[in-house]
Amino acid sequence: MVIEVPQTERVNDVDVFLSTQDGQIQRPKGPNCRHPVRQKCTNCLPVDPFDEEYLKEKDIKHMSFHAHVRKLLGSQGKGTTLKKPLENFRCSLKPNCDAHKPFPKGICTKCKPQVVTLNRQKFRHVDNIQIENQELVNQFLDYWRLSGHQRVGFLIGQYQPHLEVPLGIKATVAAIYEPPQHCREDGIEFLEDKNQKTIDNLLEMLGLQRVGWIFTDCWTANSAEGTVHYTRHKDSFFLSAEECITAAMLQNQHPNITEYSMDRHYGSKFVTVVASGDESMHVNFHGYQVSNQCAAMVEADILCPTLYTPELAYVRETPLSEEHYITDVQFSMKNEYGAEVMKNGRPLPVEYLLVDVPAGMPKEPHYTFHVGTSNKSKSAKFNVENRQAIGQLQGGANLIQYSSEFSTNQFLEQATNFHFLLYLVTNDQVQISDEWMKRLCDAVKAQDRGTAMEWAQECEDWHQLMALAHANGGSGNDVSDIPVIPNGDPFSGSSSGGSRGAVWSCGHCTFQNEAGRQDCSMCGLPAAD
C-alpha cells in the first residue's frame, strides 16, 4: 500500500528542480578579453547566483532563496559535511528543557531566546508574483466596485522558476478564492471557513495550491473618471502593522518545506498582494512578504499594532499569561547626528519587517481557467463564492443560466472555471464523490474534451444537481438575485412572476428542457425530430 504524502508536507516541485541546477551565471566574451573563444578569464568566468556586483548591476534588491542557500553552503568549504545550513529564528522559549522547571519557575540560557536585533532580510523566498490575466483581478475588484466595501481573497496557483533572477521563484496566480468574510468600507473580518479542507483537497486534484492572499484598500477619488486615492507611499506606509501581523500568521500557516533545515521547514513562500491606488490614481498591485524575524515574533505572540500610527508596530510589555515570555527586540537607526544608535522595539517601524516582491501581469495573458476565446462571447458567468451580501448567489438560477450557454460537447469549457468546480464540491445539495471530481479535474488539467463529455453524461450526481437547480430555479431564486451582465442575453428561465417559458421533453430521459437547446441538459443526447 502506497501512502501519498500531502502536498503541504512535500518539498515543492520548483525547489526540487532548482536544487539540481548549478546556478552559475554565464558571461560572454567581452571587449577586455584577450584569449581564444574556448578559454576563460576573470572578465568572462561564470559568477555565482549570489554575486553582489551582478545583483546590483541587474537592480535585484534581494537574492533568491536558493542563491542564499548556495552562499551558505559555499561558505562552509568543500570538505565539510554540513548540508542543512538553515536555522529557524526563535522568539519563544524552547519547550521541555530538562535543566529546570517550566517557566516561570525556571529558565536557562539554552531555552531562553536571544535578544532580537532586527535586520532587513537580504533574500526572499519568492522573487515575483505573476497574475495570469487582467480578467482575473477585475472579477475580484468587482465586489469593491459594486459595494464600496473592501475585499480579501486567497491567491490560487503554483510556484515556478523565475528566469529573471538567478535561481529565482515566481508565484503564478491562476484564480482567486474569496473565503467567508465580513466586509466593511474600511476593513475586513475573516469568518470561519467550514469548507477549508474540501477546498484544499480540490486544489490538490487540480495541481494547485494557495500561494498568497490579496486584499483591497481602495478609496474612490472621482467615480466618473474611475480614479482612486493614492494612500500607500513612502511618506505614509506600504503595509500597516496589523496587515504585517496578519501576513505573518498566514506565512506561519504555510511553511516552506525544505531539506536544507533540520526542522524540515524554513520561512514561507506565501505572498501578500495589496490592490490600492498608485501615483496615477488607478488601482495597481503591490507584492510583499514579511521577514522570517517578523513571522517568528508573531508566532511567539509578542508583536501587536499601534492604535493611531499604522506604520509602527509595538512589542508587548505585559505577558498574556504566566507562561508567556517576551524577549527584547531592538533595531538600529541613524540619529539626528547621523550616528548609528540602537532603539528599543517599543515602537518599531514595520519597514524593517517587509520584503518587496514585484507583482504584475505577463505581456501575453495566460488562462489556466476559461482556456481559449470561445467563452468571451458568452453572456452568462458563474457567480463567485460567498458574495451573498451583494446578491450574487451560486446554484439555482445562476447554475441554469451558466450551463445553458454550453452544449454537451462544450462541457470542457463549462468546467474550466474555478468557481464552478468549487461549487461542485462545496454545495450543500449534492455531494459529488472524490473519485468523480478527480476524474473531472484531470480532464480540466489535460484539457481532455472526450473525458469531460463522458463525465457530464455518466455522473449521476451532476444530473441530480442540475435537476435540483431546475426545480429550485423555477420557484426559488428570483432573477433579481443574479447580477445582469451588460449587453448580455436576458435570463430565459424563471421570471419574477414564477411562470415558465416553452419547454420540450427529452425522448430519452423525459427531462423537461428549456426551448432553444439542441440537446438535453440532463443526459446530453440530441433532441428528437
Curated annotation (Swiss-Prot):
Keywords: Chaperone, Cytoplasm, Metal-binding, Nucleus, Zinc, Zinc-finger. A zinc finger (RanBP2-type) spans 499-529. GO terms for cellular component: nucleus; VCP-NPL4-UFD1 AAA ATPase complex. It is found in: Cytoplasm; Nucleus. The keyword Acyltransferase does not apply. One of its GO terms (molecular function) is ubiquitin protein ligase binding. Forms a complex composed of ubxn-3, ufd-1, npl-4.2 and cdc-48.1; within the complex, interacts with ufd-1 and ubxn-3. Interacts with ufd-1. Interacts with elc-1/elongin C; the interaction may mediate the interaction between the npl-4-ufd-1-cdc-48 complex and the E3 ubiquitin ligase cul-2 complex. This is Nuclear protein localization protein 4 homolog 2. It comes from Caenorhabditis elegans. The gene is npl-4.2.
